[in-house]
Swiss-Prot record:
Gene from which this protein is expressed: rsmA
Source species: Acidithiobacillus ferrooxidans (strain ATCC 53993 / BNL-5-31) (Leptospirillum ferrooxidans (ATCC 53993))
Reaction equation(s) it catalyzes: adenosine(1518)/adenosine(1519) in 16S rRNA + 4 S-adenosyl-L-methionine = N(6)-dimethyladenosine(1518)/N(6)-dimethyladenosine(1519) in 16S rRNA + 4 S-adenosyl-L-homocysteine + 4 H(+)
Annotated S-adenosyl-L-methionine binding sites: N17, L19, G44, E65, D89, N110
Family stated for the protein in its record: Belongs to the class I-like SAM-binding methyltransferase superfamily. rRNA adenine N(6)-methyltransferase family. RsmA subfamily.
Major place of residence: cytoplasm
Protein name stated in the entry: Ribosomal RNA small subunit methyltransferase A
This enzyme's EC code(s): 2.1.1.182
Gene Ontology MF: a single term: 16S rRNA (adenine(1518)-N(6)/adenine(1519)-N(6))-dimethyltransferase activity
């Protein structure tokens, strides 16, 4: 079913807001700088505004679209040897298998607000197979991802994603550039996985746990949030003030906390 302007009808359950401003599409393409030989994957192409621009620059790439009503229109844009169309939930896609033995993936998408954060974490499970990511997200989410210690937006999301990626907010996009018009601003951002990774495999789960626990109650001090895990003396030994709050700690401090919990577990 089509709506005014010739666009397919957006489905609320998929969180669809279609990008309709060509100038913004051009800015996105300029930021990505796609090149022949790139192993590019577009998530949530919808009716294909960005897809069409990418087709002019790439001999082949893949799109992943959940909405089956979009599939026929996407397949009509180019032959399958140039445009591979997967009807799938990106949260269930095995990006490591998608990368295969080829070049690391370049992933781009205008992500639905309701799945953006879990989708980024899902992709980061395959960070070794990912060269970079460029995503349109709710501006508030981008602000949290790129936030620095001591800022109001800094929190669990900032610490977790920055542990795996260098992050950059590239530009803000006003609601009027989408249809249906969302209620909030969006922002386009870049994420580049660290090479080599900052977190060794044995530290990844303890790091996630200590970050979640540290931010569990933002108004409480670290000594309170980490009670039963690390003592005030343990924190002082790590050069961390027990009376400080999680939002004041930098990445290195959270690494030290995670390492301390692992060492503590090894002693017990």
């Amino acid at each position: 079913m089509m709506q005014e302007g010739g666009l397919p009808r957006a489905k609320k359950r998929f969180g669809q807001n279609f990008l309709v401003q060509p100038q913004i599409v051009e800015r996105i393409v300029a930021a990505i700088r796609p090149a022949s030989g790139d192993h590019l994957v577009e998530i949530g192409p919808g009716p294909g505004a960005l897809t069409k621009s990418l087709l002019r620059l790439l001999p082949q790439f893949t799109v992943v679209e959940l909405d089956r009503d979009m599939i026929a229109g996407l397949r009509a844009l180019a032959p399958p040897e140039q445009l591979r169309v997967l009807q799938a939930d990106a949260l269930e896609v095995d990006f490591a298998a998608l990368a295969g033995a080829g070049n690391a993936l370049r992933i781009v998408g205008n992500l639905p607000y309701n799945v953006a954060t879990p989708l980024i974490f899902h992709i980061l499970e395959h960070a070794e197979q990912v060269r970079d990511m460029h995503f349109m997200l709710q501006k508030e989410v981008v602000d949290r991802v790129v936030a620095m210690p001591g800022s109001k937006a800094y929190g669990r999301l900032s610490v977790m994603i920055q542990a795996y990626c260098a992050v950059e907010s590239l530009f803000t996009v006003a609601p009027g550039n989408f249809f249906p018009v969302p209620k909030v601003d969006s922002a386009f951002m870049r994420l580049i996985p660290h090479r080599p990774g900052l977190l060794p495999p044995h530290l990844q789960a303890p790091f996630a746990r200590i970050v979640a626990t540290s931010f569990a109650q933002r108004r409480k001090t670290l000594a309170n949030n980490l009670r039963g895990i690390l003592s005030a003396d343990d924190l002082r030994g790590l050069q961390i003030d027990p009376g400080s709050r999680a939002e004041t700690l930098d990445q290195a401090a959270f690494f030290r906390l995670a390492e301390a919990t692992v060492e503590q577990g090894n002693r017990s």
